[in-house]
């Protein structure tokens, strides 16, 4: 999948100094779709319960835009909010994330659960397990691989070359 004729695609970014929320705000003002895998931390201040957003993976965010816009934004933001796009080693261009992979990743990482574990793409051989589709629960419809991690069977969904996320074990599965 390439970015021909200004086609919008998903790209992964490493935002320096963990300024993901600053970049998210800027992108929102420009009408650009972005996604940050988040954790929600509940804290108590006095008698108020406060829920804070925190990046699940430091400095990682995704945007959906054209390659031209991405490169122009990178140049424009280098002084105030520097970031780099993950590059495809073969094409030497920003790595395009297929829409289906990104949808599955967002489905898993946006579930309101603290039982997710993130890995660099090289840290786990996620393709060695059985490919499955979840048929019930909060991850219904998600596809990934079953992998044994620290003795437990887990569902792993990966964005190749970027990151992998493992859920708790899911009982309702269909082998693909």
Question: Predicted regions span which residues?
Answer:
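N-terminal intrinsically disordered, low-complexity, charge/repeat-rich segments that act as generic
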Residues: 1-83
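Mixed-charge, Lys/Arg-rich low-complexity intrinsically disordered regions
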Residues: 90-128
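Short, conserved beta-turn/loop elements at beta-strand boundaries and strand-helix junctions
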Residues: 149-154
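Conserved small/polar residues in nucleotide/adenosyl-binding loops
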Residues: 175-176
């Amino acid at each position: 999948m390439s970015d021909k004729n200004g086609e919008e695609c998903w790209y992964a970014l490493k935002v320096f100094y963990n300024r993901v929320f600053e970049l998210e705000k800027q992108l929102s003002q420009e009408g650009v779709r972005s996604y940050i895998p988040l954790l929600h931390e509940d804290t108590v201040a006095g008698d108020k319960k406060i829920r804070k957003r925190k990046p699940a993976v430091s400095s990682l965010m995704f945007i959906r835009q054209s390659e031209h816009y991405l490169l122009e934004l990178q140049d424009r933001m280098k002084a105030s909010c520097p970031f780099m796009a993950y590059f495809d080693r073969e094409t030497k261009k920003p790595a395009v994330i297929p829409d289906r992979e990104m949808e599955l990743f967002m489905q898993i990482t946006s579930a309101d659960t603290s039982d997710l574990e993130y890995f660099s793409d090289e840290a786990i051989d996620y393709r060695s397990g059985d490919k499955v589709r979840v048929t019930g629960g909060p991850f219904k419809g998600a596809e990934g691989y079953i992998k044994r991690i620290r003795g437990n069977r887990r569902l792993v969904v990966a964005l190749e070359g970027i990151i992998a996320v493992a859920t708790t074990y899911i009982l309702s599965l269909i082998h693909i």
